[in-house]
């Protein structure tokens, strides 16, 4: 069996890692970066770009470049009104679900996420030199059941068997504590990423990683800080020029990139100048945006976001039954923890300097890889005890939510409770499964509904209906209801909001494989053309250098083969290019043998080579990386 890779599927960036022996390794992508932008773009020519390639063209193609798709995963259309307004791409309602409309096709958030996962899968395969089919994927600790199911579906579409869904702060704690298995400490993991915020309190000791409580906000992250800067820039420009740049998709994308850059710069500087020339134009001519932003101004306009950070911290500490003074370390995770004000808030709340020993962009993927190693048996003496982030229950008489599993219950877990009918001679009951912390059913999230029928008629309150909630190690819920009198049972694995059917997933998997095949075909085409270009160049160079030394009866065949290769490179298929290259090489072999056999012939004529690695990059040899034609002089034993 192959390796189980660990993937941090982030809102802004994604990262993949794998266990190499006893140590986790973060894998660089094809661009040489250890993180990959969580972006997908569709070009006018029909190409699909993922990662850095998608990010590079976002300004000129905003309507067809998808980012922050994680904010839509597992959520209904009416649950994302704010996210919908901020996205430059079209979000449409399809059967109550949020879909991304690109040209004439509507993509589910799971499909877009799968494209990013495919990129991470390919990155791992290129590094390992073998196929990868199994993964541990991380999610925010405060993701609900629907969002976890949707993430698992995305993995299936990408061709991955998702062995475990693991909470991001828990993964970070694994990475932080792997070499501290013999010590005992209480740790708070403060995870502020691109789109979500989690805070988890854990106890580490003797290789056991036990989550005591978790809390968070799935609507709070780096994107929200960026949006504050975007609105500030747009408002300032509107005051100066009377033009609202938010109505121009390309200008808005430029504002987004500038806002992200300014936010990063303000982490190390107290002010920054945002300079966007030719941001728009009027009859008077082009307009330029030049605005100075100070760190103090940034912190003031984001004050409400900073306030929102503290609320989950209070709840997490309270629910953990751990005193703040007893917390030994506060580990910072997520790129947004680099914001100085965030670090100051953490220090003020916990009364200690936060621990910055881990890489906030990579630590979650590292933890996922460690969990993969645990599942494979490569990592021993590690036990992970995670929790269910939200309470789970059913609707009972009066529209009340009756909880069966409380928030922060260690998982996996199984809870049973007996209920009865609300009316005389009632022969069926509807089980309305809910997730949330509010007392009334209507204020919580519906995970699913199912019916248990054929209950024998009886007075109200007499039948005994046993309801069982079962949460697996991925935090995914199954529910069953059983009539204790008849033994009749009905059960469901919650098919929650955004859950795709098996048929839909299989279709999307086929589409994903087709795209992978198309991508491979395009790469082969590019590689063959690059190789052909190299061969054409070296052939023409040899023809010029050898000149009249080439026999006159051989030159037409050589030039004809060269022209044939040029034509194939312009208009031919990969196969025709390879055939033309073979033909040219064959003619050169014939010419070379004639040159060697000619009386007094020099021996530096050889078949031209393309000297490329198939991707257009020149192969290097020797100490200085230059490719040279070496000339050899034959000498005798006396050095003459």
Swiss-Prot record:
Tell me where in this chain the PTM Phosphothreonine is found.
196
State the residue spans of region: Disordered.
Answer: 547-575, 595-640
Show the PROSITE patterns listed in the entry.
HSP70_1, HSP70_2, HSP70_3
**Ranges of Polar residues composition bias in the record:** 603-615
Q: Does the keyword Chaperone apply?
A: yes
Which family does the record claim for this protein? Answer: Belongs to the heat shock protein 70 family.
Q: What is this protein called?
A: Chaperone protein DnaK
Could you read off the lineage of the organism from its UniProt record?
Bacteria, Pseudomonadati, Chlorobiota, Chlorobiia, Chlorobiales
């Amino acid at each position: 069996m192959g390796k189980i890779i660990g993937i941090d599927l982030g809102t802004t960036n994604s990262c993949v890692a794998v266990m190499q022996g006893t140590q986790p390794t973060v894998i660089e992508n094809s661009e040489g970066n250890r993180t990959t932008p969580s972006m997908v773009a569709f070009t006018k020519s029909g190409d699909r770009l993922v990662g850095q390639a998608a990010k590079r063209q976002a300004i000129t193609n905003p309507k067809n470049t998808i980012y922050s798709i994680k904010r839509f995963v597992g959520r209904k259309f009416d649950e994302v009104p704010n996210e919908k307004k901020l996205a430059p791409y079209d979000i449409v309602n399809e059967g109550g679900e949020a879909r991304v409309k690109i040209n004439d096709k509507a993509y589910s958030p799971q499909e877009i996420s799968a494209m990013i996962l495919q990129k991470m899968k390919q990155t791992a395969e290129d590094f390992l030199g073998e196929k990868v089919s199994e993964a541990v994927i991380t999610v925010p600790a405060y993701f609900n059941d629907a969002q976890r199911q949707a993430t698992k579906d995305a993995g299936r579409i990408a061709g991955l068997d998702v062995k475990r869904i693991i909470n991001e702060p828990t993964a970070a704690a694994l990475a932080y504590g792997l070499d501290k298995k013999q010590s005992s400490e209480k740790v708070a993991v403060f995870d502020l990423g691109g789109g979500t915020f989690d805070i988890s309190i854990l106890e580490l000791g003797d290789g056991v990683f036990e989550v005591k409580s978790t809390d968070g906000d799935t609507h709070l992250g780096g994107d929200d800080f960026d949006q504050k800067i975007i609105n500030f820039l747009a408002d300032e420009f509107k005051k100066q020029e009377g033009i609202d740049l938010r109505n121009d998709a390309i200008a808005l994308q430029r504002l987004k990139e500038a806002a992200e850059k300014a936010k990063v710069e303000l982490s190390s500087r107290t002010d920054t100048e945002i300079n966007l020339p030719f941001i728009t134009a009027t009859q008077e001519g082009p307009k330029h945006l030049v605005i100075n932003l100070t760190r103090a101004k940034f912190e003031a306009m984001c004050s409400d976001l900073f306030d929102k950070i503290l609320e989950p911290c209070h709840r997490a500490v309270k629910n953990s039954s751990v005193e703040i003074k007893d917390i030994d370390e506060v580990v910072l995770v997520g790129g947004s923890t680099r914001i100085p004000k965030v670090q100051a808030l953490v220090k003020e709340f916990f009364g200690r300097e936060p621990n910055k020993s881990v890489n906030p962009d990579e630590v979650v993927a590292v933890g996922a890889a460690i969990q993969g190693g645990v599942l494979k048996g490569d990592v021993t003496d590690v036990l992970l005890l995670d929790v269910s982030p939200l309470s789970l229950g059913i609707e009972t008489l009066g529209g009340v939510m009756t909880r069966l599993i409380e928030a922060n219950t260690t998982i996996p877990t199984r809870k049973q409770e007996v209920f009865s009918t609300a009316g005389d001679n009632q022969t069926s009951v509807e089980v309305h499964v809910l997730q949330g912390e509010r007392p009334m059913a209507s204020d919580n999230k519906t995970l699913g509904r199912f019916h248990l029928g054929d209950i024998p008629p009886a007075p109200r309150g007499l039948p005994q209906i046993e309801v069982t909630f079962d949460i697996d190690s991925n935090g995914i819920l199954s529910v069953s209801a059983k009539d204790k009198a008849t033994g009749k049972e009905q059960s469901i694995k919650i098919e929650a909001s955004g859950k795709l059917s098996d048929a839909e997933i299989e279709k999307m998997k086929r589409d994903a494989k087709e795209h992978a095949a198309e991508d491979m075909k395009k790469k082969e085409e590019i590689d063959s053309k690059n190789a052909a270009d190299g061969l054409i160049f070296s052939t023409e160079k040899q023809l010029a250098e050898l000149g009249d030394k080439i026999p006159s009866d051989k030159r037409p065949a050589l030039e004809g083969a060269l022209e044939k290769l040029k034509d194939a490179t312009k208009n031919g298929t990969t196969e025709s290019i390879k055939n033309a290259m073979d033909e040219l090489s064959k003619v050169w072999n014939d010419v070379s043998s004639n040159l060697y056999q000619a009386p007094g012939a020099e021996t530096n004529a050889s078949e031209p080579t393309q000297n490329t690695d198939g991707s257009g990059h020149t192969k290097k040899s020797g100490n200085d990386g230059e490719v040279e034609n070496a000339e050899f002089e034959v000498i005798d034993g006396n050095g003459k």
